[in-house]
Amino acid sequence: MLINKIKQDNRTLRPEIQRWGCYFLCLHYYTSLFKKREFNAYEINVAYYRFIGLGYIKSNCFIINPCMMLNYYGIRSSVRYESFGYLGTANEFEISEVKIDKVNGYHFIATKNKEILYDSLDLKPLRKIFKVT
């Protein structure tokens, strides 16, 4: 299954991924894109436990070391925080933080120059109001 078809409401995913796994799923989206690798929900769950065991994420899907997660799949990367108006270069990829109207906390989506590439909650089709922070 293409990763962009796997959403957080997929009941096969671990409950922690369903609730907090947006950044985790974005990293797998980029892995799928760069490595031409497809993931199914079972493989995402296995990766969740693997990366907890390696200390790259916490059980609530808080990402401790995204570079090591990508490195596991053979993607060499570095991470930095950029302000809202930053436009990535051709060899960069983005995970953008968004604030959903009337929802506590934040959500993360894969973007490229303000275009949404992958959103594990499918906010636009659900007509949810949100903004990139």
For the regions a language model picked out, list residue spans one by one.
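Short coil/turn linker and secondary-structure boundary residues
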Residues: I17, F39, C61-I64, Y118
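Solvent-exposed loop/turn segments at secondary-structure junctions
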Residues: Y29, I100-V103, L123-K124
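Hydrophobic, Leu/Ile/Phe/Ala-enriched alpha-helical segments that form helix-helix packing faces
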Residues: Y30, L70-Y73, I109
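Active-site-adjacent structural segments surrounding the nucleophilic cysteine of cysteine proteases
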Residues: M1-I57
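Residues in well-ordered beta-strands of folded domains
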Residues: N4, E97, Y118
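Helix-adjacent hinge/juxtasegments
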Residues: Y49-R80
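Noncatalytic regulatory segments and standalone regulatory/sensor domains
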Residues: T89-E92, K112-T133
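Active-site-adjacent substructure of cysteine-protease-like catalytic cores
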Residues: R76-E115
